[in-house]
From Swiss-Prot:
This is Maturase K. PANTHER family: MATURASE K. It holds the Pfam family Intron_maturas2. Usually encoded in the trnK tRNA gene intron. Probably assists in splicing its own and other chloroplast group II introns. It is found in: Plastid, Chloroplast. GO terms for molecular function: RNA binding. One of its GO terms (cellular component) is chloroplast. The keyword Transferase does not apply. Keywords: Chloroplast, mRNA processing, Plastid, RNA-binding, tRNA processing. Belongs to the intron maturase 2 family. MatK subfamily. InterPro entries: Domain_X, Maturase_MatK, Maturase_MatK_N. GO terms for biological process: mRNA processing; RNA splicing; tRNA processing.
Length: 522
């Protein structure tokens, strides 16, 4: 019991007071505008000019916003009148102002709450002298590890982390990290107001869906804190169910600009939960070989143990969410499968274990005999069906995979249209470079290439055949990666559609720190 209480003891040194005054600083919102609102780095978000404002007008709106936050009666009028959006100074029908102000506040607030964690990132890395820690942020960093480890495991559990999450639970989780009471009150007030402004993001019971296309930076941070709280309990259970010494290392994969190591996320209420339930069931089984990986709302748990052992872990997770987070979680959302005959979807790949049998004839004196050798290989494939569904949602093709034009891009220049399609194709090729079978990826490239030609033909009111003949090799080269372009210069005639290496050659890149948008949509 003393060991359990010591493990859950709160670390007050991590709490940072006096963050609330930062809400009234202009540079916070200027920083949020540069890092959050301007999403030119994403291929599925239009530039800010499309919404009708630029950096100059946004600066004026920031000053107006700070002035309104200073007015104390302004908050009271906003709470008393739920039909009028007084927090932004306009009625609900003025979508531009409500959308801009709420987005600006959420982005600025996200930067403020990230400050306590950003200050703690440099010192732990220097103290422990972790070499090339930036490589650990890569999503592809997980696959070489899976290649080496999954060959020796028996079962895999596909876990869907439950959402939506009630707003009060999110605020209570942050109370363990931040002791600035005004800031927490402002967060609670903002989330309730955000529920009134954007009812399509939040359900009627005031729970937040965190995987919408329009999910803001603040909600990504709140989701990370929620998942870290869940994984903290799992780390505790893992430490006490293993014979071996366990070291946890966690990354915030959902945040592109925020990377952290969390070791102590504590809550006193959790002691009661663990003592009441886990203390009776945890010590009844041990699992010395278990691995856990997560990205966004999906996690996998692989083990060398038996099916009964995996079921015990399954019900531990179910009870965790029901008793601690007060979330009714159905057990069917956790699937237990045998690795030898099951493919699981994770990080944009369909992964499985392939068994290859080879026969060798041996001759010894007058006797000859055959030796059958069975080898197991970790295989990763491109989920073609999922990607086609994502392309159809993004209006690049139909559900059946037939390419269509992109009408929203017809206002761009020809070079701009070709560059956008080419960038999407190159990003997909870069992300799925670890696939052992790339034929499916070539089909995705064909859909994007023909969709680009149809978009250009629609813009100029011409035929696809005309533009294919006019652009020729230029249109083709835009859809090559750098490696494919180098190979096309060497063998321009022998290979009409050059490939980088063999069909089964797998390359894992350590510079990919977020999932491709098309993969994320699937």
């Amino acid at each position: 019991m003393e060991e359990l209480q010591g493990y859950f003891e709160k670390d007050r040194s991590r709490q940072q007071p006096f963050l609330y005054p930062l809400l009234f600083q202009e540079y916070i919102y200027a920083l949020a505008h540069d890092r959050g609102l301007n999403r030119n780095g994403s291929i599925f978000y239009e530039p800010l000019e499309v919404f009708g404002y630029d950096s100059k007008s946004s600066l004026a709106l920031v000053k107006r916003l700070i002035t309104r936050i200073y007015q104390q009666h302004f908050f009271l009028s906003s709470v008393n009148d739920s039909n009028q959006n007084r927090f932004v100074g306009h009625h609900h029908t003025n979508f531009f102002y409500s959308r801009f102000y709420s987005q600006m506040i959420s982005e600025g607030f996200a930067i403020i709450v990230e400050i306590p964690f950003s200050l703690q990132l440099v010192s732990p890395l220097k103290e422990k002298e972790i070499p090339k820690s930036h490589n650990l942020r890569s999503i592809h960093f997980n696959f070489p590890f899976l290649e080496d480890q999954l060959l020796h495991f028996n079962y895999v559990s596909d876990i869907l982390i439950p959402h939506p999450i009630h707003m009060e639970i999110l605020v209570q989780i942050l109370q363990c990290w931040i002791q600035d009471v005004p800031l927490l009150h402002f967060l609670r007030f903002f989330l309730h107001e955000y529920h009134n402004w954007h009812s399509f993001f939040i359900t009627q019971n005031k729970s937040i869906y965190l995987f919408s296309k329009e999910t803001k930076r603040l909600f990504r941070f709140l989701y990370n804190s929620y998942v870290s709280e869940c994984e903290f309990v799992f780390v505790f259970l893992r430490k006490h169910s293993s014979y071996l010494r366990f070291t946890s290392f966690r990354t915030f994969l959902e945040r592109r600009y925020f990377y952290g190591k969390m070791e102590h996320l504590q809550t006193e209420h959790l002691i009661i939960v663990c003592c009441d339930y886990f203390n009776r069931t945890l010590w009844s089984f041990k699992d010395p070989f278990m691995h856990y990986a997560r990205c966004q709302g999906k996690a996998i748990l692989v083990s060398k143990g038996t099916h009964l052992l995996m079921k015990k872990w399954k019900y531990n997770f179910v009870n965790l969410w029901q008793y601690y987070f007060h979330f009714w979680y159905q057990s069917y959302r956790i699937h237990i499968n045998q690795l030898s005959n099951h493919s699981f979807y994770f990080l944009g790949y369909l992964s499985s274990l392939l068994k290859n049998s080879s026969t060798v004839r041996n001759q010894m004196l007058d006797n000859s005999f055959l030796i059958d050798t069975l080898t197991t290989k970790f295989d990763t494939a491109v989920p073609v069906i999922f990607l086609i569904v994502s392309l159809s949602k993004a209006q690049f093709c139909t559900v059946s995979g037939h390419p269509i034009s992109k009408p929203i891009w017809t206002d761009l220049s020809d070079s701009g249209i070709i560059e956008r399609f080419g960038r999407i194709c190159r990003n997909l090729s870069h992300y799925h470079s670890g696939s052992s079978k790339k034929q499916g990826l070539y089909r995705i490239k064909y859909i994007l290439r023909l969709s680009c030609a149809r978009t250009l033909a629609r813009k100029h009111k011409s035929t696809v055949r005309t533009f294919m003949q006019r652009l020729g090799s230029r249109l083709l080269e835009e859809f090559f990666t750098e490696g494919e372009q180098d190979l096309s210069l060497i063998l321009p005639k022998a290979i009409p559609f050059p490939f980088s290496g063999s069909h089964r050659e797998r390359i894992w890149y350590l510079d990919i720190i977020r999932i491709n948008d098309l993969v994320n949509r699937s």
